Curated annotation (Swiss-Prot):
Gene (name only): gdt2
Family matches, as SMART domains: S_TKc
Organism, as annotated: Dictyostelium discoideum
Keyword Transmembrane: yes
Family: In the N-terminal section; belongs to the GDT family.
Protein name from the UniProt record: Probable serine/threonine-protein kinase gdt2
EC class: transferase
Recorded phenotype for the gene knockout or disruption: Cells initiate multicellular development prematurely.
Cytoplasmic side: 918-1637
Length: 1637
């Protein structure tokens, strides 16, 4: 009995001991600790592993059971050996149990003879300067270890405990969960600068007294490893006794140590040790020294291997101890989402290591640290690392002598890297690197190709990723804000990007950077984009990519990314707006059809300081019919006035090309009108050079894309991709598309076969307006597996040489990432990785390209590959010859069919001749417009050999057309349209056709020009009913193009009335034109088809006062967002449609009103002749004067009574919903029985501050539809006043300016002048908008621009602010007619300083202080307010994020600490204020004579603009400027001080009545010129009239914010020239006036 009780007691104790344990227990052979086995993903990431789906061994963590048998503490909070049972004189393993909260006795330290291993399941705190000497620490789940200024010293494990940890976690720290904090009380890491060879000045400290008696350890440019010296000091000057630092070393870090005692907290070791963090441990390390930590060397990994019993999976029979365990580093952190390492020093072990820092699936913030050691990498980020933010760290590396012999087993990171990453989410800003061969090495390997952790998830880590072998990566950007290093020594490579072939179709982008080192990429299956890159010094791009895009970049001599064998290899290349040095540029010849390669080659090395190529046309391969005309254009930007003597010369390899201008002197544009006479192709080259100078002074050579000249093509064959065995036909405009291709690669009997790796999809979204077209695009095919080629084989005629192929795709996005589309013909690429983007809505994609059948093929193979979410719906083939359609048919007797058909055709032709003859006279003066519907494309009815009127060439509308003509036709598809093509910058954009005759660009980049006539009367595209989001929104346009501005009359253009459905089409025509808008609705389809062609007679339309009924035929928001392109529609809109709402209180109505009331008798609802009584006829929703809350649903009821003896049918058209309101009702139609009251309910919800005045249109008709009446029911509701504004209530008055992020208009809101800023969607970050608005709402200061409210209209965000009519400060600095006195200048500066002082007191930095963002309200120094600070789009609250590192603002106004990659502080605004003062007084833009790239260098060298002694003779003014732009931020004054100082300065000038205006200095008395006064006055009157006109223009162009005044600076030269002429005319008059005065 006693034996049984004893056993039970042992089991209970054992179970209690193991309450902390997780995982299963594993038994090991004698001499080893038993192990616990944990599946890390299941226990730490909560990601379930499906049985037998993956090999779980790589996911398993084995840790020793040391804590099971450890001695546990008594119930005491004081940590001492007495509180643990057992001998205090032997090394012991002890454990602080769960719930215990122990603190080390302040008078004690832990001696190695007492403790071997300390296990913490409760809480343990060690205080200041206490030393813990022990073998290791194990933090169990839930445990907490706090080391506050304590010292940890690791020693070898006890020799008396003979058991071995097979996985070598100890000595060191092993954390399985809970939290660890290692925090020092004193800052230990400092920066310094050399004064003499052995003297340093230590930054940010006034005295070195706290470190008296210490040694100093130093890392610098010359010493990448730690060097230690004794020192003496005087205040913060440090003189080293054992070390000499060269004065040329600019990056010096130092820390202090007390001969190894680590007085201020740290870890040292007498043996090899490591820190292993897992289990979502919360880790915080700050002001702490980790010295000589780490076990893993840079040799090949050698992990411990376990052999398990075949009978028992929990029994290990043999163990082979690894000699180089991976991840036993200074710090290895995995599965931890809260890690902070700040202002600490991490020194690797004394030998070589793989890396000091290794992270795996963790979120880490590491900043302000020194990481130094002999290692393969300074930091390694593995799979699953969700987020690493590294900033202001100093990574110093000594390359090891040992490297692994094989890259297998995930043996990466040994190459000498700064940061090596297998994760894309690395943010490295302002980090300093010293000694590395490679700064950033990114290796994106699909997991199935990596042994070891081959099934580990990586970002984004989702539930299913563990069982998915390889996920496609999202597009990855390397930009200046994310990867922004400071490299001390030259490196071999700035960036290496590698991806194996399994990771396909991913775009990698390097952008917004100046790069002086090499980049190597291995992206065989992916694309690389270089955007806004400046390559200097040793920049070189090498490697291999599938597609290379280069945009807006400049490459200096010997830095060109040459293409081909000597540089980077790519199958497809896109080069636009980028310059290359002639001798270094090499271009491969095998370019695919979709490539657009237009480099600007230059020979003059500093050409970018004199002249730049702004744009060219055409920018991609161009197709044009024989006899067509084209303007070849090169637009230039002249930087230096020396380059006024330039000429452009055109060269051609085709003698049949004629041009009216072969060599032409130019100012800002070269233009060559060309005519093409014969079939074939031509290559053109334009040379821009200095006039009358030899070839050595060539500025640019531009080789234009190939131009193809062709005759018309005819329709040959078409196929619809249906899963159909029937030989059905879809007829579109007389062209037959056969249904279905057979799935068989060996079926030669069919004219179309498809590879068998496809899947079908049916019922794709209806995207058009014709049943035939809907049927053509209703079904589609794609590959079963992602990125797998689908091949279609179809017949062609072997004798025909030229074909065009047109493919119709529908893209249905599965996420917000673009889908790359690749197309091949006969295994040759046509398009590679064309990105299809559509946010969340499906899009229609039409791609057209040429095929030259030079091998006389009878069959052609067309292949495509996508992610699996883009479907080929149909295809068409066009032939250059008239050939019979290749579909076999049975031979039948056609005579009985042909004879009656011929008779019928003759009769119809006679009728048509009579009909069109009668119409000829009526239209003979009109410009004829002809359109046929094939998708949304235009085609020519020019006589050809086409057997049916189909596209002579299939065309795609494109938005980037640079042809222009004063007499042109333009059809523009709005930016919100879902018709998508590839634009000139290779982004998918809405499309535009704009022609001199007609010019069109295909999605392939091929541009077709042909003489196209468009006939609106033949176009009828019927609306469809679709509850899903349609592809094309309704749009109409009433456009007045007459010279006298008179509006069009509907009666005059009745035959031009059409219903157009297809994406906000803007139509400009010389002739008359009238189009109505009908949006989708829930009415009966047949009803609107019946009513659509009806236009109400004038006597049937209700009489409406001006503003009472205003249709909105123009898409307002898109015209406002593109004021340059839509100049004429914008002018028309501002003139005619000031706003939708018209006058306050007037009623609006639905745009389909005319449809519903057509052919009815309109009567007021109180009219006794109306056969139905309506009550109430004004609905106020029971408010009784109360105002509605936003979001409140307001209900009302309308009752109808039929006064007739027969039933009536009532149809209702409710107001259209928008961003400000929604009107809804369950009733759209009801039957009204005789003499019976019938009621309907409706509700209105308001979402903005608005006065809601709308109408419900009601149509009554008899059941036989022989009689019909219509009336209005009025809706009236008003919301509470909030800061959410209804855009419909804003009256837009005029365009002011456009900046990077938005467009600004002057407007009126509820009788108050306001500035309306529309934010461009491509720059909209909704979180940033909310932050800015939250900031604006809280700012209330007389010198800060007043925030009025916000709005959303048609998906566009807008901000409304106070309007300052006098414009921005820049105008008063740089325009002569606005010169201001010194008193006015000082008064303006006072207001600016007061505003900024207010911002800084509230923890806000402006970050973009410059004259363009200062608005002038008054020039009277006595006014309460003279200036206001605006544009808070770049402001940040410093108390929200302590480290403001987003690089924004104007470079000339950026302080040295920003440009040297430092952080934003309030003092950066002071620096900008100093530059503003300089510009204000000197009337010169800072660094105006320097190129953009030089400014940063000058600022960092502390070279400021020179102060003209004549201008800055007042030392008070010059003192403000020089103190504000001081290199040392701590020496800059505050805005509170500046405000007081400027007020004192204003009194000084005001008292002395000094007018400091250089324009008035030269006025002299001249009494001899009185006789010339009158003549000069006459001339001056004329000049004044011109000036007044200019004043009016300037008043309309006052700039508000967001670069609103940039145009002022750009136009200064022109203004100065005009003013100089004026001043010359007025010179005598001025002298005379002065004399008279």
């Amino acid at each position: 009995m006693n034996y049984i009780l004893y056993i039970l007691l042992i089991l209970i104790i054992f179970s209690i001991n193991n309450t902390f344990s997780i995982g299963s227990f594993v038994y090991t052979p004698d001499g080893y600790y038993n192990l616990y086995r944990i599946n890390k993903f299941e226990n730490f990431s909560k990601i379930p592993t499906k049985a037998n789906s993956v090999n779980v061994e790589p996911h398993e963590l084995y840790y020793p059971d040391i804590c099971d048998s450890a001695l546990k503490n008594k119930n005491s909070n004081e940590f001492s050996i007495d509180n643990f049972p057992g001998s205090p004189f032997l090394k012991a393993n002890i454990k602080i149990t769960k719930g215990s909260n122990m603190t080390l006795d302040p008078l004690l330290s832990i001696h190695p003879s007492y403790i071997n291993i300390l296990c913490i399941e409760g809480s343990f705190t060690a205080g200041s300067q206490q030393t813990l000497t022990l073998g290791g620490i194990i933090v169990l789940p839930g445990g907490n270890f706090h080391c506050n200024n304590c010292v940890l010293q690791f020693v070898d494990l006890s020799s008396t405990i003979i058991k071995i940890d097979p996985f070598g976690f100890l000595p060191g720290i092993l954390s399985l969960g809970g939290s660890i904090s290692l925090i020092g009380s004193q800052r230990i890491l400092y920066s310094a600068k050399p004064i003499e060879d052995n003297v340093l000045e230590v930054n940010d400290i006034s005295t070195l007294d706290p470190f008296n008696g210490f040694n100093v350890s130093i890392v610098s440019d010359s010493f990448p490893n730690v060097r230690t010296s004794r020192f003496t000091y005087n205040k913060n000057k440090l003189e080293m006794q054992d070390l000499t630092i060269p004065t040329t070393d600019l990056n010096i870090k130092l820390f202090f140590n007390d001969s190894g005692s680590l007085k201020f907290g740290g870890i040292s070791t007498r043996t090899k040790s490591s820190i292993y963090i897992t289990g979502d441990t919360k880790l915080h390390i700050e002001n702490y020294l980790l010295d000589s930590i780490g076990k893993t060397s840079n040799k090949e990994y050698d992990d411990t291997k376990l052999t398990f019993s075949s009978d028992n999976p929990n029994n290990v029979t043999d163990i082979i101890i690894g000699k180089n365990q991976r991840f036993r580093n200074s710090l290895y952190i995995e599965f931890s989402n809260s890690v902070t390492i700040k202002n600490s020093v991490i020194i690797g072990n004394t030998g070589s290591s793989r890396s000091s820092l290794v992270f795996f699936q963790s979120n880490v913030n590491i900043s302000g640290n020194l990481i130094v050691g002999t290692a393969g990498s300074s930091m390694i980020a593995q799979y699953g690392t969700e987020y690493i933010e590294s900033s202001n760290n100093y990574f110093s590396l000594v390359l090891p002598n040992e490297f692994p012999t094989s890259p297998a087993f995930m043996d990466y990171g040994h190459e000498g890297n700064g940061i090596y990453s297998l994760s894309p989410n690395i943010f490295s800003t302002n980090d300093i690197f010293n000694g590395q061969k490679i700064l950033y090495n990114f290796n994106f390997i699909s997991r199935e190709n990596v042994t070891g952790f081959d099934k580990d998830c990586f970002a984004p880590c989702d539930i299913n990723s563990i069982v998915v072998p390889s996920l496609s990566q999202e597009p990855i950007d390397f930009s200046k804000n994310l990867v922004n290093p400071i490299s001390i020594n030259p490196v071999d490579y700035f960036l290496i990007v590698n991806s194996d072939e399994e990771l396909k179709n991913t775009f990698f982008t390097i952008k917004d950077s100046t790069i002086s080192s090499k980049i190597i990429v291995n992206l065989k299956g992916s694309g690389l984009v270089l955007k806004n890159i400046i390559g200097v010094n040793n920049f070189k791009l090498t490697g291999q990519v599938k597609r290379l895009d280069i945009y807006d970049s400049f490459f200096g001599s010997s830095t060109t990314p040459s293409l081909g064998d000597n540089g980077i290899k790519s199958s497809a290349v896109i080069i636009k707006n980028s310059s290359f040095y002639i001798d270094d540029f090499q271009l491969q010849n095998n370019q695919i059809y979709g490539s657009s390669i237009v480099p600007y080659l230059y020979e003059l090395l500093n050409v970018d300081e004199f002249i730049l190529v702004d744009s060219i046309f055409p920018t991609s391969q161009y197709q044009i019919p024989v006899g067509g005309k084209l303007d070849l254009i090169v637009k230039l930007v002249i930087i230096s006035p020396v380059i006024s003597r330039i000429t452009c010369e055109l060269e051609s390899d085709n003698e049949t090309i004629t041009s009216s201008a072969i060599s032409e002197s130019v100012n800002k544009e070269c233009k060559f009108p060309l005519t093409f006479k014969n079939d074939g192709s031509v290559n053109l080259k334009v040379t821009v050079k200095l006039k009358n100078v030899g070839d050595s002074e060539i500025m640019y050579i531009i080789n234009f894309p190939k131009i193809t000249i062709f005759s018309n093509y005819s329709f040959y064959s078409g196929w619809s991709m249906e899963n159909s065995t029937e030989n059905g036909i879809i007829s579109v405009d007389g062209n037959s598309f056969k249904k279905g291709c057979s799935i068989s690669s060996n079926d030669n009997s069919n004219n179309c076969t498809i590879s068998n790796n496809i899947k079908y999809i049916t019922n794709l979204p209806k995207l058009n307006i014709s049943n035939d077209l809907n049927e053509l695009f209703l079904n589609g095919i794609t590959s079963i597996n992602s990125n797998e080629l689908v091949t279609i084989t179809t017949r062609i005629d072997s004798e025909t040489k030229y074909y065009q192929i047109q493919l119709f795709f529908i893209h249905q996005p599965i996420d917000d990432q673009p889908t790359p589309l690749s197309i091949y013909i006969e295994n040759q690429p046509v398009f590679l990785l064309e990105p299809l983007e559509s946010n969340s809505a499906p899009i229609f994609k039409n791609l057209t390209f040429n095929f030259d059948n030079i091998n006389s093929l009878e069959n052609i193979n067309i292949s495509f590959a996508t992610r699996g979410n883009t479907y080929l719906t149909s295809m068409a083939i066009y032939s250059s010859l008239v050939i019979e359609y290749p579909i076999p048919v049975e031979k039948i007797n056609l005579l009985p069919i042909i004879v009656p058909i011929c008779v019928t055709v003759l009769v119809l032709l006679s009728i048509l001749i009579v009909f069109f003859g009668a119409r000829y006279y009526k239209h003979k003066k009109r410009r004829r417009l002809e359109i046929a519907v094939f998708g949304v494309e235009l085609y020519s009815k020019k006589p050809s050999n086409n057997k049916s009127p189909v596209p002579s060439t299939p065309l795609i509308i494109n938005s980037n057309q640079e042809q222009s003509s004063s007499n042109h036709i333009s059809i523009t598809v709005n930016r919100n349209s879902d018709i998508q093509t590839q634009s000139e910058n290779n982004n998918l954009e809405p499309t535009t056709v704009e022609t001199t005759t007609t010019t069109t660009t295909t999605a392939a980049g091929a541009i077709l020009q042909t003489n196209v006539t468009l006939e609106m009367e033949n176009l009828e595209i019927k609306p469809i009913i679709n509850n899903n989001e349609p592809f094309f929104e309704d749009y109409s346009d009433e456009y007045d193009d007459s010279s006298d501005g008179a509006e069009l009359n509907e009666d005059d253009v009745e035959d031009y009335i059409n219903i157009i459905r297809g994406g906000n089409i803007k139509i400009e025509a010389e002739g008359e034109l009238f189009v109505r808008q009908f949006e989708r609705n829930t009415f009966d389809q047949e009803f609107f088809e019946y009513k659509k062609s009806k236009i109400p007679s004038p006597h049937l339309v209700p009489s409406l006062a001006h503003g009472d009924f205003i249709e909105n035929p123009l898409n307002i928001i898109d015209i406002l967002l593109d004021p340059v392109t839509n100049e004429i529609p914008l002018e028309h809109y501002l003139k005619t449609y000031k706003n939708r709402n018209g006058q306050s209180g007037k009623y609006r109505t639905n745009t389909q009103t005319h449809v519903l009331i057509a052919d009815t008798i309109f009567q007021h609802c109180n009219d006794p002749d109306l056969p139905v009584s309506v009550s109430p006829y004004i609905c106020d929703f029971g408010m009784n004067g109360r105002k509605s809350d936003l979001g409140e649903v307001c209900h009302d009821t309308i009752t109808f009574k039929n006064k007739l003896s027969e039933p009536l049918y009532a149809l209702f058209l409710f107001p259209e919903g928008d961003d400000s309101s929604i009107t809804s009702s369950p009733f759209q139609s009801i039957e009204l029985k005789p003499n019976v009251e019938t009621s309907i309910s409706l509700s209105v919800t308001l979402f903005s501050t608005t006065k809601y005045n709308e109408k419900v249109i009601v149509r009554f008709e008899t059941l036989d539809v022989k009689q019909s009446w219509s009336t209005f029911v009025f809706l009236r509701l008003e919301s509470e006043l909030t800061n959410i504004i209804d855009f419909n209530e804003i009256i837009i008055k005029n365009y002011i300016s456009e900046g990077t992020f938005g467009i600004v208009y002057r407007g009126i809101w509820r009788s108050s002048p306001v500035a309306v800023k529309l934010l461009k969607n491509e720059y909209v970050d909704h979180d940033e908008i909310e932050k800015e608005i939250s900031l604006l709402e809280r700012l209330r200061h007389p010198n800060i621009l007043l925030y009025v409210g916000r709005f959303i209209f048609s998906g566009i965000h807008g901000i409304v602010t106070d309007y300052c009519s006098k414009g921005c400060l820049s105008k008063y600095i740089h325009e002569n007619k606005y010169k201001i006195t010194i008193i006015q200048k000082i008064r303006i500066l006072i207001d600016i300083s007061k505003a900024c002082a207010y911002l800084h007191r509230n923890g806000i930095t402006h970050r973009d202080l410059k004259p363009e963002n200062i608005l002038i309200t008054s020039l009277n120094p006595k006014s309460l307010v003279c200036a206001k600070v605006s544009d808070f789009g770049t402001s940040k609250e410093t108390n929200e994020r302590y480290n403001l590192q987003t690089r924004r603002g104007t470079v000339a106004y950026m302080s040295n600490e920003i440009l040297s990659q430092g952080s934003y502080t309030k003092s950066t605004d002071i620096y900008s204020f100093g530059m503003l003062c300089y510009e204000l007084f000197s009337e010169r833009i800072p660094y105006y004579s320097e190129p953009h790239w030089r400014i940063r260098e000058l600022v960092l060298k502390n070279e400021r603009p020179s102060l003209d002694q004549e201008i800055f003779k007042d030392t008070d003014i010059s003192d403000i400027v020089t103190r504000c732009w001081s290199k040392n931020p701590s020496q800059r004054p505050t805005f509170d001080y500046l405000s007081k100082y400027l007020k004192h300065l204003l009194k000084k000038y005001d008292i002395n009545n000094i007018i400091y205006d250089k324009d008035k200095k030269n006025k002299k008395k001249n009494k001899n010129n009185n006789n010339n006064n009158n003549n000069n006055n006459n001339n001056n009157n004329n000049n004044n009239n011109n000036n007044n006109n200019n004043d009016d223009h300037d008043d309309n162009n006052n700039n508000i914010n967001d670069s609103d005044c940039d145009n002022n600076k750009n136009n200064n030269n022109n203004n100065n020239n005009n003013n100089n002429n004026n001043n010359n005319n007025n010179n005598n008059n001025n002298n005379n006036n002065n004399n008279n005065n």
